[in-house]
């Protein structure tokens, strides 16, 4: 029995963020990311081969954070820098990925001897069904550096996310983000 998924290396990512710093004492930040890639799914067993499927994998997440400046310095109207920390909530939604358990279930529990000739249709139906998406939510903590020069805003943020089922076998994960934007 052979099940092969193409690698997810080189996935494309699109994201955005907005934050409001008009509230005294804290800032509120919202950001989102959408990532995706295409990959080939191939399956073989003693009975035969499944026709190869080219499938698009997509995942999205949102983060809402309340953050507070820890320390900062500025040259009024020209430049500034600050270190901030924050806490927030997040949501994640990912299309399922073809794995051995899924294929085994679609073949009626017999990976070795089941006829895979119609597995491609059943697998596509399963992967495209919104009910099978992997949805998760959790909370996160983050710390970051912000640099401003006139209207140009740059952030370097480390965020640690606590959410089950986003990464198989892990209940948390860290990310490092670099952002560039314009302050309005």
Regions flagged by a language model, labelled:
Residues 1-21:
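Short glycine/proline- and aromatic-enriched beta-strand/turn motifs that initiate or cap beta-hairpins
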Residues 1-6, 35-59, 93-135, 166-170, ...:
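Flexible, solvent-exposed loop segments that connect beta-strands
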Residues 13-17, 61-67, 140-142, 177-179:
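Membrane-embedded beta-strand positions in outer-membrane beta-barrel channels/transporters
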Residues 17-105:
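Gram-negative (and chloroplast) outer-membrane scaffold detector with strong preference
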Residues 147-151, 184:
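A generic beta-sheet turn/junction motif
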Residues 154-164:
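Transmembrane beta-strand segments that form the barrel wall of outer-membrane beta-barrel proteins
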Residues 172-184:
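Outer-membrane beta-barrel "beta-signal"
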């Amino acid at each position: 029995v052979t099940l092969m998924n193409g690698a997810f290396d080189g996935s494309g990512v699109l994201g955005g963020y907005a934050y409001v710093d008009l509230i005294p004492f804290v800032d509120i930040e919202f950001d989102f990311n959408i990532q995706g890639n295409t990959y080939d799914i191939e399956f073989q067993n003693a009975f035969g081969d499944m026709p190869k499927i080219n499938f698009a994998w997509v995942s999205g997440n949102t983060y809402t954070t309340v953050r507070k400046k820890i320390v900062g310095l500025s040259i009024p109207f020209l430049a500034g820098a600050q270190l901030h920390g924050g806490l927030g909530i997040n949501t994640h939604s990912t299309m399922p990925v073809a794995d051995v358990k899924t294929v085994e279930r679609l073949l009626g529990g017999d990976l070795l001897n089941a006829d895979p000739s119609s597995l491609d249709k059943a697998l596509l139906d399963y992967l495209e069904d919104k009910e099978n998406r992997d949805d998760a939510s959790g909370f996160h903590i983050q710390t970051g550096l912000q640099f401003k020069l006139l209207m140009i805003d740059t952030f370097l943020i480390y965020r640690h996310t606590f959410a089950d089922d986003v990464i198989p076998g892990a209940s948390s994960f860290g990310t490092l983000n670099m952002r560039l934007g314009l302050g309005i």
